[in-house]
Amino acid sequence: MAMVQPKSQKLRLFITHLGLLIFIAAIMFPLLMVIAISLREGNFATGSLIPDKISWEHWRLALGFSVEHADGRVTPPPFPVLLWLWNSVKIAGITAIGIVALSTTCAYAFARMRFPGKATLLKGMLIFQMFPAVLSLVALYALFDRLGQYIPFIGLNTHGGVIFAYLGGIALHVWTIKGYFETIDSSLEEAAALDGATPWQAFRLVLLPLSVPILAVVFILSFIAAITEVPVASLLLRDVDSYTLAVGMQQYLNPQNYLWGDFAAAAVLSAIPITLVFLLAQRWLVNGLTAGGVKG
């Protein structure tokens, strides 16, 4: 006999679906509007969602090509967007790899080893992570100004300095990976030790292969945080050619000349690396996000 849903349940289902559709529309509308602005003629922030006439001039400029207008004028690319994009990917990729390496080894020590002050160190790391980076900008500038005198490749106006600054944000990732490690039975490592494995071999050959989901999550979160970060990068980087895309895009919004179309094209380009990284690692993402929430 067919089951008949009561009217109240149908109403709840309808309201739920309607709410989800509104939520999806609220997320998609800004993205579609940015794409529409990048395809309009001129540099205007207002207009319809569907352009009257599609123009690729902003995309050509963003990709480094000059644009020739009907009256014979030639507009060269105002900024090196592709170079900024490469700088962003390079800094974010190296930062993410470094954070995964540091967080993993640190979390292993907190999850498997006993030493005095372990709980205090864990809490202290988390407390320091709660302070916004803006509060440390003056100290960071002074620190990297002095470091650059002795180690030039991590001084001011260097990508090494930006990466070195980003590597300090590992506290939350240490907690996340530590929680994941504690869900893995330590008897596996004990069995490896009985077979003659050293602690490093047990960590590398037993624990790490089982921890790929959480490592993928930490890599993605670190990559996104680094590629979209502005305050620290804008403080440490001075030359236009050394900018990341997040910092360089501010050049389009000069109070005397707002290049909204060019800005929109660069903004869409900036989302491509994040999307690719997410698509490549999505099969591990859900497992990793739901597995590290263990009380430690």
UniProtKB/Swiss-Prot annotation:
Alphabetized Pfam families for the sequence: BPD_transp_1 (PF00528)
Coiled-coil intervals: none
GO biological process, one term: maltodextrin transmembrane transport
Gene Ontology CC annotation, any one: plasma membrane
Keywords: Cell inner membrane, Cell membrane, Membrane, Sugar transport, Transmembrane, Transmembrane helix, Transport
Subunit (UniProt): The complex is composed of two ATP-binding proteins (MalK), two transmembrane proteins (MalG and MalF) and a solute-binding protein (MalE).
Listed NCBIfam families: PRK10998.1 (NF008231)
Protein name: Maltose/maltodextrin transport system permease protein MalG
Protein's organism: Salmonella typhi
Organismal lineage: Bacteria, Pseudomonadati, Pseudomonadota, Gammaproteobacteria, Enterobacterales
Name of the gene: malG
